[in-house]
Amino acid sequence: MASEATRGRSHPRSRSISPRLISLESDAPAEHTFRELVAAYLSATPKVIVHQQGGIRSNTRAVVSSFRERIGAGARLDDAQGDLVLYDLDPESPSGLAHLTFRLGERVLELLRAAGPETASTAREEDWDERDNIVDALAWEVQRRVTQAWLGPRVYGRHERVNPIRWLEASRALERIGDHAVLIAIHGARWRETEPVEAERRLLTEFHHQALDYVDGALVLLGDPRVGSANAALDLGVALRETARTLVDRLLAARSRNSPPPLAVVSLGWVLHSLDRVVAYGMDIAEIALDSARSARPSSHGPPSEDNKGGNEGHE
């Protein structure tokens, strides 16, 4: 109903942002439509209008409906003069950026824990992707809220006076950890099919626990940043990554009596690569905590700085 779509609900900081029009060709691929929807959502627009030449196709409607379900938050979808209108894109009582980022962190830790070599279920790859979709949606929400914070009126209280880009950086690191957790689960299942010996299983499980604990510790630091603790965490991250580089040979040496099958070598390589990336992204979070702690230090040149340096660059 056009009247409902016209009214709608919006986050206070979205009201100064114009509705976003997505104009599609008649044969627009579903993947392209989905990317356009994500970009529109991240722009912090309060309303997305989808127009398609020749009228909305059934596959386009399905993509928009699926996207609405992904973002949740009570988002509504209506028809309006032949177009699709997606609105009410924000919760009525949105959480703060810190709360939202830590909720994302909890989801990522759950996913990473479930993906462990000894704990991963025999779920299909599609099931793991579905879990990762939840992580992606939370990361999108953080980015949307950061955009609202920058484009909307500055209404921060004293306790909120923090550079929101830090939460965006942390959420992106967490999103990538979630991606690698899925890869660990998928390739770990293939590795288990090669019937690894107990010593091999134990070594890989121990390193997975270390990577999981590292990310957990980085999130604790993000909530309570301290210079000394953050530096210690970064040193530990370097040591863990060095361990990952030597672990393949140690793991395969456990199969001393037989040459490991190619599937074992490839699967182990992928699992260890992803565990290395998990630690690297955890280091990014520790660096964000370190920057926050440094910014909070009293300065003889004025009030604490809200500038933020970037984390490790070039991660996959």
Predicted regions located by residue number:
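Cytosolic, long alpha-helical scaffolding segments
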Residues: 1-316
